[in-house]
Amino acid sequence: IPHNIDGKYQPDAYKYCAGYQYDDKTIVGFSHTHFNGTGHSDLGDILIMPMIGDVKLDMGKADSTELGYRSHFNHKTEKAEPGYYSVILDDYNILAELTATDRVGVHRYTFPKDTKDGHIILDLTYGIYNYDGKVLIANLRVEDEYTLTGYRITRGWSRMNYTYFAVRFSKPIKNYGCRNTEKVKYNGFWRKFDMTDNFPEMFGNKLIAFFDFDFSDNKPLEIKVGLSAVDCLGALKNLEAETKGKSFNEIKEETQNKWEKELSCIKIDADYDKKCVFYTSLYHTMINPSIYQDIDGRYRGIDHNIHQATKGQTNYTVFSVWDTFRGEHPLMNLIKPSRSEQFVNSMLNHYLQSVHKVLPIWSHMGNENWCMIGY
């Protein structure tokens, strides 16, 4: 989706930058926040990975995928279009498909026929440019047999990144559990519960959960993941507002129509190869900055307080100004002037909320990173 909250919805195969490198041979999973075209790294929040067989709560290694949940893949089975991605996870023979709305990542997983032991891994420890201690805390609640909510707070390049989420499955959960290997001592009375086996609230800074589903009907599993930087209620509202009652195919069609409209703002007369180069480049100009605001107008500011956008205003984040001031923003002034105005207003709000009273230098997810110069 152009300028959506994810930045770029894709598989995670590489541990730096945007999380994907063409030379990689394995996919770790599918997370919900990414950069596009950066040299530095962060994000990769809320990783989902389907698998069959015995549940594995370790990532595994690229040269020994049997030790974890990651899978080999082949570029011959990949398909990437604006608004859609698919690939076969070779270790499991699972077809993975992705699409999105402005604030919701949408998955569809087709498991092999007659699968009996299908699982979804939800890894809240994973991150791009990951290291021990990056996840400060994570929480996961099973609201009902179809719905999860939760959050995680990380300290990476973004000094304090709040990611709230709501997950909706198309099939009921049969069984679930988790593993939390944190070493922080906890002396409260929650320790009397066994969080690892069907306990509906899981908490920790090294939390990986699994969910079992019945695939005897041979139907694919669809998963919708709403995101918010404000709270879980905001993530649920975003999920409902943008995807309620819609199938994967319907959302994919809407998303691709939106991309078609966006990319049609410039028309060129050229051969096929030149058109591919041109429109791929134009596509990349429409990924960042990213929407950073709930459907009800609330957003987390640079001061980490919750603000309410004025009517007609959309708050954006991911301003790599030293990259974009000379190319991206002049182009947006020409082809998308109303959106460019929203970018400027977001920058001005950044200034007003900044204790240093500065415009964005390199900001993302409600944080100023002080990387490079932009003015």
Q: Which residues does each predicted region cover?
A:
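Accessory carbohydrate-recognition regions in carbohydrate-active enzymes
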Residues: 1-329, 333-375
